[in-house]
Amino acid sequence: MSLTAFLIDTPAMREHAEQAVDLLGYESASPEIVGGFASSRLDNYTAVLILKTAAYIGDDPLLRMAFSGLRTDLPPQEDQTDWEAYATYSDAVPSPNNVPYSRYWHGYTFALRLLLCLFTFTNLQMLLLFAQTALLLLTVLLMVRRGLQQLIPAFAVSWFFMSPPALGLCLQSAPVSLIALLACSLLLALKPALSRSVGLPVFFALIGLFVNYFDLLTFPVVSLSFPLILLIALETKTTISFGGLTREALLCCVGWALGYACMWMLKWGLNFLVLGQDGIAAVGDQISLRLSAGGESHSRLDILLRNIRIVTDKTAYRVILLAVLALLLALLIRRRPRRFDGRALLLLLPLLVPVLWTLALSNHASDHTYFTYRNLCGAFFALFALPALLAPDRTPSP
């Protein structure tokens, strides 16, 4: 798809790309939908990058355009700020100021280039927001169908903490959120069939693969934690043992990690073949940077807490947290369980994975706290789901 993307070129695509970049430039680099809430911040800087990369027009060889992630960044003109110059789309050929961004797949290029032929950017934003809303409703309906209605408050609140309007309107955030919701829906609807056909670890590997292909390292762990929590919840309604569920959950985590890592290594390998040593050197520098701490003045733990505080520092979110905790406490009191289901403790796995991810990639989590905090919303979901699974209603399912 990356190769065929640049064969798509229409006047409408160029016009819509130019209008979109102009609009984002007018809005500023990082506007907030709700003032003071970093969770509602839109990353217009990266959205401009995505649009200029997807709609790039050049006379470069097709392979180089497909794997370099080229865009045109014009220098500031008289009386023009750096941001105004950056938020300018150019379809001049040959492009005088090409900037490569080769470490990512830029898998969005084909779809976005095609969609820009049909829709203006604002129409596309509304369609993405609708797609997210539709998948959210589908996931909730499937949770009811599979007898997981007790998890709906935990699921809804955890997703709400990610600021759904920002997820739907921001080009950078849309791929991960849509893939995560689609994975949840497929798992809820087709879990027995997936187990018999491809196998659940392979299904999770495909999730990791597609996230890596379409995402620019935003909050990919959401695509693991949310489906994994639903899988654990589904399995606690069967007769699977603690050991059997532990093995299954771990294999799914390994599958996701392998799919994610192998897709990235494939990109690096192709970079080497197409772009030579320069492409690999750029990737190596970024790996070292992202695995470093956020700076000498901030420990990894400080950066983790800063990400958590995107949610916990806001009064509105604290009220919601207290309301959910009160609801969960009332649930436990009403059920008065005589014994607990120990398999629910496996929710510690999707709770810990986002924490470990944030600690490992602390440089990235420090630079981009306003969206990397969303990785931890999977941990919120696991924490909120724990009481419901520890003391479940006994309605076994196949």
Predicted regions and their residues:
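Juxtamembrane segments of multi-pass membrane glycosylation machinery
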Residues: 110-128
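Transmembrane-helix motifs of polytopic, lipid-linked glycan transferases
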Residues: 129-153
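Membrane-interface helix-loop-helix junctions at transmembrane boundaries of multi-pass membrane enzymes
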Residues: 329-352
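Aromatic- and kink-enriched transmembrane "portal" helix at the membrane-lumen/periplasm boundary
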Residues: 110, 156-179, 207-213
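Membrane-interface junctions at the ends of membrane-embedded or membrane-associated helices
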Residues: 188-200, 233-247, 334-339, 387-398
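Membrane-lumen/periplasm interface segments of specific transmembrane helices
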Residues: 249-327
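Membrane-interface alpha helices of multi-pass inner-membrane proteins
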Residues: 200-230, 248-262
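Hydrophobic/aromatic-rich transmembrane helices and adjacent perimembrane loops
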Residues: 368-389
